Amino acid sequence: MKFNKVLENIQTYEAGKPIELVVREFGIAPKDVVKLASNENPIGTNPAITKVIRSNADIAHLYPDDSMFELKEALSRKFDVEDENIIIGAGSDQVLEFISRALLNEASSVLMSAVTFAMYEIYAKQMGAKIIRTESYEHKYDEFIEAYHTYKPKIIYICTPNNPTGDATSREEVLKIIEGVDKDTLVVVDGAYMEYAAAKDQKHAIAPTDLLKYENVIYLGTFSKAHGLGGMRVGYGIAQAKLIKELYKMRPPFNITTLSLLVAIEACKDDSFVEASIALHQEQIKRYETFAKENGISYIESYTNFITYLFDENLDSTQISDALLKRGVIIRNLASYGMNGVRITIGTEVQNDVFFRHFAEVIS
C-alpha cells in the first residue's frame, strides 16, 4: 500500500511512558511506581468531577450536545469573551490540528523555537509544511522576527510557558512578536501551563483578552494540567469570531465525549482545586531547586508544573532515565529534543521523596 509521501518525514509522537509498561517490563507493583513524566496533576481528580462522572455514567450511550453551549458559556464567563470566540477540541492538540489543516500546505512554512512542543512539527509536517526553528529554546523577539522576515511563515507558535523546558516569555515580549508580523501570519499562543505562570509572576501571565484585538492570533488553553483532567481530553482555542468560524469547518461532529463535556463544565465552576494544585506545586518545586543546587545540577527556572534539569558531560540523561525506570520512577528524557537533560513533573511530597532518594543513588 502506498501512503502519502509526507509521512516519510514524520516521527510518531512519543508520550511519557505509562505505569503499565513499568509493571510489565520490570515486575514492579503499580502502587510502587512513581510517574513524573507526563505533567499530570499529582493531586488526582477533583472530588466534584468524580461525583459528576458517577452521576452521569448511565448516559454514556448518548451523544453530547454538539453545540457545547454550556461549556462555551462557562468559558466565556471565565475569560470575559463571547461564545463566538471559542472553539472546543479533544485537548488543545486537536485545535492545533484544526489550525494546521485550515492554513497549511506544501508551499507553507511554520516557525517555532528550537525546543518546544513536538505536536507543532508533527501537525505541520502532516500538511507538507516546512519547519523553521529559531536558535534557542527561548522565544526571543530578535530571533523570531529575523526568521519571520527571512521565511514568511504561515504560522508562528509561541509556547509560553514552554514545554518541555518550562521557561516563560513575558507578556510584553509576546505582544512585541505579534505586532512585528503581518496579518497573513497566524500567531498561536499556547497557554497550556498559563495557570502556573500567572500564579508565579503576573509579568508572564497572558489572558485571552490581551490577544483578542489581533485578528491573526489564537490563544490555546486546556483542562489537562491545573484542572487535572488530562484523561478527559478537553481543550479550547480563543480568537476573533471570523477565525473561529473558519476553524469550525475542520471540526468533526461530537468531537468531545458526553462525560468530558460535563466535567469540563463542572471544572469551570470553582477554582479551589486549581488553587490547591498550584499551592502544592509552589511548595514542592522549591525542593527540586534546592536539590539541584546541592548536587551541582543546572535547571531552567520553571513557570509550569514541571522542572527541567540540565546535565554536564559527567551525567547522561538517557542512562539516568533508564536507571530510574528500572527502579519504578518515570521521568521524561529530553535526548530526543537534542538536550542532555530530563523533565520532571512536580509530584506530591511522597512522590518527590521517592524521586530524590533514587535520583541521588543513580547519580552517585
From Swiss-Prot:
Gene3D superfamilies referenced in this protein's UniProt entry, alphabetically: Aspartate Aminotransferase, domain 1, Type I PLP-dependent aspartate aminotransferase-like (Major domain)
EC number: 2.6.1.9
Keyword line: Amino-acid biosynthesis, Aminotransferase, Histidine biosynthesis, Pyridoxal phosphate, Transferase
Single biological process term from Gene Ontology: L-histidine biosynthetic process
Pfam family membership, one: Aminotran_1_2
HAMAP family per the UniProt record, alphabetical: HisC_aminotrans_2 (MF_01023)
CDD domains in UniProt: AAT_like
N6-(pyridoxal phosphate)lysine modified-residue sites: 225
Record flagged with keyword Transmembrane helix: no
Molecular-function GO terms, alphabetical: histidinol-phosphate transaminase activity; pyridoxal phosphate binding
Keyword set includes Chloroplast: no
Similarity annotation: Belongs to the class-II pyridoxal-phosphate-dependent aminotransferase family. Histidinol-phosphate aminotransferase subfamily.
Cofactor list: pyridoxal 5'-phosphate
Protein name stated in the entry: Histidinol-phosphate aminotransferase
Pathways involved: Amino-acid biosynthesis; L-histidine biosynthesis; L-histidine from 5-phospho-alpha-D-ribose 1-diphosphate: step 7/9
Gene that encodes the chain: hisC
Complex formation: Homodimer.
